[in-house]
Design a protein with these regions (language model features):
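MPN/JAMM (Mov34/JAB) isopeptidase/deubiquitinase module and associated MPN-bearing subunits/adaptors
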Residues: 1-113, 117-210
Length: 210
């Protein structure tokens, strides 16, 4: 899997940053992604045993007040699975999806894509990620993919990036991310040192049943 990551990193190496879309990432969703990732890759666990994680993200999509760009409002993250490789799609998790959709129906939210971790690999989309993202966008063209690497994450770096395929389904673009309060994400990590000091191999986060 590491070899695939290294060989396919060029898929997003030249990705341009979108000026037509902006992600507002709510703190609850961001921290859920962090917790899930650190459950299976942290300083207490042998690096050879680090695992990737995957989950869904949900929220709403709207236009800004000037109607010049879209706002992808990610309000919640849904931990789903972990393993040596995560390439699952919505179709693989019908039972989990039913639980999520029941909850989302009460809030007028929808599935906006997925998140996954690259423990020590860096922030990009691999060939496997490309195929997964393509399947999401065929169902919902605004779907995005979030990638998190805890080895990059720090008090001045969010360790997370967002990607989406352009209409040609061959080229990725980066979607800028801000905290939901409008501040840059780098200014919204007050609990970084708490996370790093407290995370250990005993932390458990609930994943939805498949």
């Amino acid at each position: 899997m590491l070899e695939e990551h290294i060989n396919s990193s060029n898929l997003t190496k030249k990705a341009k940053t979108s000026d037509k879309s902006l992600i507002y990432l709510h703190t609850e969703a961001y921290f859920k992604i962090i917790y899930h990732s650190l459950c299976y890759a942290n300083k207490q666990r042998d690096k050879n045993n680090w695992l990737e994680v995957m989950g869904f993200i949900s929220g709403t999509v709207s236009q800004d007040k000037t109607k010049t760009y879209e706002i992808i409002n990610i309000t919640k993250a849904w931990p789903i699975s972990h393993g040596n490789s995560v390439s699952v799609t919505i179709d693989d998790y019908g039972k989990s999806l039913n639980k999520i959709m029941t909850d989302l129906s009460k809030t007028n939210s929808t599935i906006l894509g997925w998140y996954h971790s690259h423990p020590s690999y860096g922030l990009f989309m691999s060939q496997t990620d490309f195929e997964t993202q393509k399947s999401y966008q065929k169902m919902y063209d605004k779907a995005v993919a979030l990638v998190f690497d805890h080895t990059i994450w720090s008090s001045i770096n969010t360790g997370i990036e967002a990607y989406r395929l352009l209409p040609d389904f061959r080229t990725f673009e980066k979607i800028p991310i801000q905290a939901s309060n409008g501040f840059e994400m780098n200014l919204n990590i007050p609990l970084y040192h708490l996370f790093m000091n407290k995370i250990d191999d005993n932390i458990i986060i609930e994943e939805l049943d498949i």
